[in-house]
Structure formats: C-alpha cells, structure tokens
C-alpha cells in the first residue's frame, strides 16, 4: 500500500514534506518515514501491545498512528513545530473517530525533545535524524537517567542515521547494537539500526 493509500485508510494526512528548514540549525526539516520502510522494520522487530514508544520529532504523527494501528502499542510523539503538532492532534481526532478507537494510547507533546520527561514505562525511542548531535546526546542522557531510576530493557531505533549518531551509539558504554534493517537502495544510510540497553 502506498503512502497516500495508507494515510487515506487511517484517515490522517502525513505525506507532505516540509519545504525549507527550521530556523535553528539544531532541528532538521520534517520528512516522514516511508510506510514501506516501517513495514520492513516491524516485520523483523515486531512490537507488543504492552510497549511504550516515543517518537522524537514526530511531525504529523505517521509513526505513531502506524504503530497503534498495527500493534495497539502506546505511542508518544514529541514535536517542537506548532503547525505539525496541531496537525498531529487533528490527525488523532480523525483517526479515533474513523476507527472508533479510544485516544488514551496516543499522545502528542509540544516542546523541545531534550525537555521531554522519559517515563518509567517508555521502552522504545525512535529517531529519524531529527536534530543535531548535542540534542541527541542530551536525550540519550535523559534515557540513561530514567534507566538508573527504573532499570529495564529499552531500544533505540535510528532511521537513516547520521555518522555522528552512529559513532556516538556504537561507542556508548550502556548500549549495544541489536540489529540492522536495510531498506531501499538510495544510499548506504537507507537503513534502521536498533540499539538495546545493557540494563
């Protein structure tokens, strides 16, 4: 199923790509993960209904709705752009209405990703190269702090990862690479890399 058909089926609108760039060089432009790549990822690494997934730089919420639709997991999206945040909320209304589903397992937060308070139940964290390395490092520090307070296994999913993200995670003392899923053939970066905590 192509992106427009997926969006139509879920009664959401996530396809449009941001034109131009964010006013801060720390934050990158919005571009949703292709649905066919999500299908490939989760065929190899399926989720459970009991999982809690946080998408940093969620945009209009494509990943959130896809995961909820397929796995019924709890999903949280963090977005700094007000327009995208309100589009995600509109998508949530349409999605819930069309599928007669309750909304309590889908959440969106407006604000800086590095200010998001990681909760004890959060166990998957998704990044599509949404911001600069210093912000990514701060978020990983927040996740590690949460693990120190509430020990558990967590997974970091990187899509189209930058060399800086990869180097940082490959050399992090508290995470190990769990696997890779290659998708598409545009570039060698066209992949997902999954890291798991050693806790």
Predicted regions, residues:
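S-adenosyl-L-methionine
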Residues: 1-49, 87-120
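Glycine-rich SAM-binding Motif I of class I
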Residues: 61-65
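Conserved short alpha-helix immediately C-terminal to the canonical SAM/SAH-binding motif I
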Residues: 84
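C-terminal substrate-binding/active-site "lid" region of AdoMet-derived donor-dependent transferases
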Residues: 135-194
């Amino acid at each position: 199923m192509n992106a427009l058909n997926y969006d139509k089926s879920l009664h959401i609108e996530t396809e449009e790509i941001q034109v131009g760039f964010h006013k801060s060089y720390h934050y990158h432009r919005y571009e949703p993960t292709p649905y066919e790549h999500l299908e490939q990822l989760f065929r190899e690494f399926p989720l459970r209904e009991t999982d809690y997934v946080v998408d940093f730089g969620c945009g209009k919420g494509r990943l959130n709705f896809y995961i909820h639709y397929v796995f019924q997991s709890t999903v949280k999206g963090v977005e700094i752009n007000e327009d995208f945040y309100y589009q995600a909320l509109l998508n949530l209304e349409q999605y819930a209405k069309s599928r007669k589903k309750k909304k309590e397992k889908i959440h969106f937060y407006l604000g800086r990703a590095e200010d998001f308070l990681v909760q004890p139940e959060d166990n998957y964290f998704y990044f599509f190269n949404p911001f600069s390395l210093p912000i990514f490092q701060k978020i990983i520090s927040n996740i590690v702090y949460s693990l120190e307070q509430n020990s558990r296994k967590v997974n970091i999913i990187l899509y189209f990862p930058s060399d800086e993200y990869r180097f940082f995670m490959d050399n992090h003392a508290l995470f190990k690479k769990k696997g890779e899923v290659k998708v598409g053939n545009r570039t060698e970066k066209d992949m997902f890399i999954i890291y798991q905590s050693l806790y």
